[in-house]
Amino acid sequence: TMQAGDTEAAIPFTIDFNDIAGNVGTQVTGLTSGSSITYDETVPTLTTVSIASNNSEGATLATVNNIITLSIVADENIQTPTITIAGNAAAIATGSNGETSYTATYTMASTDAAAAPIAFTVDFKDMANNDGAQAVALVNDLDGGVTFDKQAPSFTTVSIASNNATNTLAKVGNVVTITLASDE
């Protein structure tokens, strides 16, 4: 049984044996396949966790039907992670079991809550089943989070006036001013 603090490496072993007649067999110190079992107690970590949107106005903005991409890089090979974006299961777009880099995507829906920033989770473990700490924050992402805004803007005030003595009329040389106030 492996114990915490044991050396992380290929596990050495020897097998000494005899047959029922007492003949000593050749000592075995390795698997006939040439493979080995490696002891690993180190918890994996994520060195990069970044998020972006495909919104044409910028990677930190999202609206309904925008695709959110979460990218991660681990410090060692990990099993395919479980990723949520805005509380929904994200589809793994790149990376396969036993790699260090993965991307996951989710298309924002009208049923998703507006958020600034969009929340996410990344659950992952290394190939030896050591659980990494759930990621809920960005790591080495220079842009910051993505804001999901699903509300269309509207004007709360729209007015027009001229600098004519009667501000509802205009003639050549008068300046017409339109004043708009938006809800966002």
Model regions and ranges:
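Extracellular beta-sheet repeat scaffolds used for adhesion and glycan interaction
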Residues: 1-7, 11-14, 27-33, 55-60, ...
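Repeat-associated, polar segments at repeat-unit boundaries in modular proteins
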Residues: 17-19, 35-36
